[in-house]
UniProtKB/Swiss-Prot annotation:
CDD domains recorded: AAK_UMPK-PyrH-Ec
SUPFAM superfamilies reported for this sequence: Carbamate kinase-like
Family stated for the protein in its record: Belongs to the UMP kinase family.
Source species: Aromatoleum aromaticum (strain DSM 19018 / LMG 30748 / EbN1) (Azoarcus sp. (strain EbN1))
Gene for this chain: pyrH
Annotated localization: Cytoplasm
Residues engaged in binding UMP: G54, D74, T135, G136, N137, P138, F139, F140, T141, T142
Cross-referenced InterPro entries: AceGlu_kinase-like_sf, Asp/Glu/Uridylate_kinase, Uridylate_kinase, Uridylate_kinase_bac
HAMAP family found in the cross-reference section: PyrH_B
Binding site for ATP: K12, L13, S14, G15, G55, R59, T162, Y168, D171
Enzyme class at the top of the EC tree: transferase
Record protein name field: Uridylate kinase
Amino acid sequence: MSVAAYKRIMLKLSGEALMGDDSYGINEDVVSRIVAEIAEVNRLGVQVGVVIGGGNIFRGMKGAASGMDRATADYMGMLATVMNAMALADAFRRAQVEARVQSALRIDQVVEPYIRGRAIRHMEEGRVVIFAAGTGNPFFTTDTAAALRGSEMAAQIVLKATKVDGVYTADPKKDPQAQRYHRISFDEAIGRNLAVLDATAFALCRDQKLPINVFSIFKPGALKRVVLGEDEGTLVHS
């Protein structure tokens, strides 16, 4: 049996990842595939937390740019993450994997409120915990929520699931000579002005010495390879 390199992980999953090739909303086939990948890692004995974005339904920054009050737009974005979290939890149910949703905004009739001790207990008992509503505060991204929850849960790594298979020296879509960084330190990433997470999230991970791995969620088996400690994605470390 494969031995995981990490006992507890915090996976940052963007809302856009749930769209697949659609222009909006939730693509059930894509969700089922992502859930199957997470379930495979969970069966290795890895404790999994997931922070989900909401950009496939509503983006607070975009709403604010169109003239909406920024705080209102951000709260709407948080509610979008709750919808995504519920869709993920239902997909886990269908895959016969126990999962719980905890929301930083209280919606007690629908999902659990975020309670740190309860979340840790769920993870210790093998349940996947999906953290919704970001940090519960406007002006903070779901990247920051992933760094925060990762720190609170004592995760050993934050995994940022993206559309590209790591951090590159340049945009690989524009520059065919772009090279993927296999490993890079926090200080090197800052010095080279690499966009790994947003600045607040990045600073929190750096201060907590919480490593980050940026990888492609659309590459089959990539999540498992990251968890096994193989050369997948880009590892950002202290």
